[in-house]
Structures are given as structure tokens and as C-alpha cells.
């Protein structure tokens, strides 16, 4: 069905969500314009070479674009976590009892470039670079740009402009627009483990590496050039914090003391530490996601989350696919092919999109914060490791009945809210199964009791 639009759909933000949505809608023939504040050729890529974990949810959206195989060429499979202890002992924790399941490490910049390249091939999609959205006029459905100071007209506006969204900033001035933001007391800084000779990997390439140290931690994800992008999650203030590590000598000694194996592999550590920015970790919630068919929020603009389930990008891509599916729902289309799409039709689409996404977005936001404390405090803990072993045992012995929360989040497309509910039940099962097993002996796990507990808590 041909859709008539008097003005283009305008997407604010040409990042991952904005580019993916422009690609999908553009492939269907919608006239699209994308306003992106950054230049077409990003500068200082290394300082912003943030890596992301791509899971099944994101892969599903990329598959819909038709370019998933091309995109996975720049990704590296990660089969589990590699935990680095203070004495440099490494312990591998598989993500799943199924060895065929894995996450992908992918550079945000490279992924964004691929999506944008494919989108720019479409004649009905136009990018406007180096021009930020300053504000929007909700009544007129227009955008005032910051750099060129022009007024851009749109049939509808889709805000994909991140956690500090200018589109959302205009919406929160409305009556009955809920909004909240919550910061962790930790921030993060990107660092690097370079490749070895001939672009070899200096630590295991198929793992997400974690150095848990109680009140702080460091992680590292592999790059296709053999390097690793490291992220230090660290308190902003306190005896050991970003504020206290204020000299090269202090930083050098800190990494020698707390990350001795990584320290030996980071020749540019001090330059990276003082040149790269320290960024905050924020959870953002707002409701509603839309206003009268004139504007809708997608991804971080609607629900920024902390990165500790590796789901920020995946949740945003899931938003994109859900919104696209709503655009494809013919029951929401104009009844006549010669009638232009109007605000009523967009409003129907956006209402359905929010109904399907809000509870799930809230769920993953809450679980991401929980997982921060798990990764920081417990991944090196003996009881935590034992529970993981028991969980894998249950997945093998009861494959259709017991599925871990992590499995549901990372290796399925089941709703996040469902994964949260199942995760609570799973914890009750695990707590009862390990009770009294003080020597953490997997052979002592009572599978008959496990069967009874699964029936009791999961109704399976």
C-alpha cells in the first residue's frame, strides 16, 4: 500500500537506532530525513571506540534490514566471561550451557558506519550532518536546528537522539509528561589493550574480560584488529576514585596494584587515561513516549539504561523493530490509498508501540542496575560461581523447563518483563537447591528436588 506524506518523516539522531530505523522505513518507501549533530566523518574515533555487545535481539533487527551478514563481518563472537583475579588467575564462565550460543563484540562506530552506508544508498533518505536539534515546536511539528538556525518541517518527528535527547527535552515541558533520571555514583573511562605483533590478540579473543575489584571493575571487549577496548567503571569520588587518581604516578601505581596482568599489556595507559573523557552512567525514564502523533521517542531518548547487561543497543534495536512493525500493521494505515498519512494514523502507531515497549524498557533498566552490582561484587565469589554451575546443570537436565534470566535476555527475544519475572523465580529455586551445600559440590544437587521446585515456582 502506498503511503502519501506531505512532508518527510524526520528522525533526530543518526546513531545506531536512528540509522537502523531510517534504513527500515526507507526500504519501505517512506520519505525520510535524518538530522545528525556529528559530522559525516567522525573525528577522534579512537577516543570514542566504544564496543558494544550485540545479542539475539539486536541481530533480529539487523536481519530485518537484510544486511546482517555484512555487519557480522565486523563482529567477534564472545562465548563467555573471562574473570581476572587480583593474582592474575583467569576463570572462564560460559554464557550458556549451549556452546553454540554467544554474544558479538562490535565497534559502535563501525556498526554505525555500516548502517549509514546502506541507508544512504536509498534515494528517499536524506542525511543532514553537523546540525543539532535545538528544540521542537510540538504544535507545528517543526524542528529548530542549532548550527544552521533553520526551521525544518516534518510530517512526524522521531527522537533517536540519545540519553540527553533534545526532542525529549521539548516534550517534558508538556503537562503530565513524566520524567526521571538517576545517576550511579560510578562513571566510566575508555582505555585500550593494543594488538600484539601482526594484529594478534594478547588475551583470549572470544571472551568478555572482567576484572572485578569490589567497589570498581574493568572490562575489555575484543576488536577485529586484535586490540581490546577496555572500560574502567570507577567511583567519581572517594579514596579510590577518578577524583583521587589525579597524577600519572597515582594512575600508574593503581593499575599495577589492581590490574597487574592488564597493566603489562597497556603501553599507552597513562596517555589514554588523561586524554579520554570520564563519562557518567544514567538511567532515564519518561512516559508517554509520544505526543499526538507528532513526535515519538526511541532508544536511549525514551529509556537510557546503564550498560551492565549489554542491552542498551539491543533494547534500542528492539524499539526500532517494534516501531517498524507498527508501521507495517495495515490495521493502522489510512483506509484509503489516496488519503495522506496524518497525525491520527501516527498516533495509532505510536500508542501501540508504547504499549509493547514501556514495561519491557523499565524491566531491562532495573535488571541492568542489578547486574552492575553482580558483575562488580559477585562474579569472583565462590557461592555465585557455584550457583552458575547449578544453573547450567538445570538447563541441561531440564532444557525445556528451566531457562536462566541471562539466557532469556541475551539469547532470546522473549519480553524483558517476562525475563525479569522468571529470574525472580529462578533465584528462589537456586537458593533452595544450594542450601546446606557448604562445600559447593555439584554432585550433591538433588535433581528430584529441582524437578519439584521447577513445578512449584515456574509451573512447568
UniProtKB/Swiss-Prot annotation:
Pathway entry? Cofactor biosynthesis; NAD(+) biosynthesis; quinolinate from L-kynurenine: step 1/3
Q: Which residues cross the membrane?
A: none
Catalytic activity reported: L-kynurenine + NADPH + O2 + H(+) = 3-hydroxy-L-kynurenine + NADP(+) + H2O
**What are the BP-aspect GO terms?**
'de novo' NAD biosynthetic process from L-tryptophan; anthranilate metabolic process; kynurenine metabolic process; L-tryptophan catabolic process; NAD metabolic process; quinolinate biosynthetic process
Q: Tell me where in or outside the cell this protein is found.
A: Mitochondrion
- Keyword Mitochondrion carried by entry: yes
- What cofactor does this protein call for? FAD
MF terms per GO, please?
A: FAD binding; kynurenine 3-monooxygenase activity
Membership in a protein family: Belongs to the aromatic-ring hydroxylase family. KMO subfamily.
- Spell out the protein name for this chain: Kynurenine 3-monooxygenase
UniProt gene name:
kmo
Amino acid at each position: 500500500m502506498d503511503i502519501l506524506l506531505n512532508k518527510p518523516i524526520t528522525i533526530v539522531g543518526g546513531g545506531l537506532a536512528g540509522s537502523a530505523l531510517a534504513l527500515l522505513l526507507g526500504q519501505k518507501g517512506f520519505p525520510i530525513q535524518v538530522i545528525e549533530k556529528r559530522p559525516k566523518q567522525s573525528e577522534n574515533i579512537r577516543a570514542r571506540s566504544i564496543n558494544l555487545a550485540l545479542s539475539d535481539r539486536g541481530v533480529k533487527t539487523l536481519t530485518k534490514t537484510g544486511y546482517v551478514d555484512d555487519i557480522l563481518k565486523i563482529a567477534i563472537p564472545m562465548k563467555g566471561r573471562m574473570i581476572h583475579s587480583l593474582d592474575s588467575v583467569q576463570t572462564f564462565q560460559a554464557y550458556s550451557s549451549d556452546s553454540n550460543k554467544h554474544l558479538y563484540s562490535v565497534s559502535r562506530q563501525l556498526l554505525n558506519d555500516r548502517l549509514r552506508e546502506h541507508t544512504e544508498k536509498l534515494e528517499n533518505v536524506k542525511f543532514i550532518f553537523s546540525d543539532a536539534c535545538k528544540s521542537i515546536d510540538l504544535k507545528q511539528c517543526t524542528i529548530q536546528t542549532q548550527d544552521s538556525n533553520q526551521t525544518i518541517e516534518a510530517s512526524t518527528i522521531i527522537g533517536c537522539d540519545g540519553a540527553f535527547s533534545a526532542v525529549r527535552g521539548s516534550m517534558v515541558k508538556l503537562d503530565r509528561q513524566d520524567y526521571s533520571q538517576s545517576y550511579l555514583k560510578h562513571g566510566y573511562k575508555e582505555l585500550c589493550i593494543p594488538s600484539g605483533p601482526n594484529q594478534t590478540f594478547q588475551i583470549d579473543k572470544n571472551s568478555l574480560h572482567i576484572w572485578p575489584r569490589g567497589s570498581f571493575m574493568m572490562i575489555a571487549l575484543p576488536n577485529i584488529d586484535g586490540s581490546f577496548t577496555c572500560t574502567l567503571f570507577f567511583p567519581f569520588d572517594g579514596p579510590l576514585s577518578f577524583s583521587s587518581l589525579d597524577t600519572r604516578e597515582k594512575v600508574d601505581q593503581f593499575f599495577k596494584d589492581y590490574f597487574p596482568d592488564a597493566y603489562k599489556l597497556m603501553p599507552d595507559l597513562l596517555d589514554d587515561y588523561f586524554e579520554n573523557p570520564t563519562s557518567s552512567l544514567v538511567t532515564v525514564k519518561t512516559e508517554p513516549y509520544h505526543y499526538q502523533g507528532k513526535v515519538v521517542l526511541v532508544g536511549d531518548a525514551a529509556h537510557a539504561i546503564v550498560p551492565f547487561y549489554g542491552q542498551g543497543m539491543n533494547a534500542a534495536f528492539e524499539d526500532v523493530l517494534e516501531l517498524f512493525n507498527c508501521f507495517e500493521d495495515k490495521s493502522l494505515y489510512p483506509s484509503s490509498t489516496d488519503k495522506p498519512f496524518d497525525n491520527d494514523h501516527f498516533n495509532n502507531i505510536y500508542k501501540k508501540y508504547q504499549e509493547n515497549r514501556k514495561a519491557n524498557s523499565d524491566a531491562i533498566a532495573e535488571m541492568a542496575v542489578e547486574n552492575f552490582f553482580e558483575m562488580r561484587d559477585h562474579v569472583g565469589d565462590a557461592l555465585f560461581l557455584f550457583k552458575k554451575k547449578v544453573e547450567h546443570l538445570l538447563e541441561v537436565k531440564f532444557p525445556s523447563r528451566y531457562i536462566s534470566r541471562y539466557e532469556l535476555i541475551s539469547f532470546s527475544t522473549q519480553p524483558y518483563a517476562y525475563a525479569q519475572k522468571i529470574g525472580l523465580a529462578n533465584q528462589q529455586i537456586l537458593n533452595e537447591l544450594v542450601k546446606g551445600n557448604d562445600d559447593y559440590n555439584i554432585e550433591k544437587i538433588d535433581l528430584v528436588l529441582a524437578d519439584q521446585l521447577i513445578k512449584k515456582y515456574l509451573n512447568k
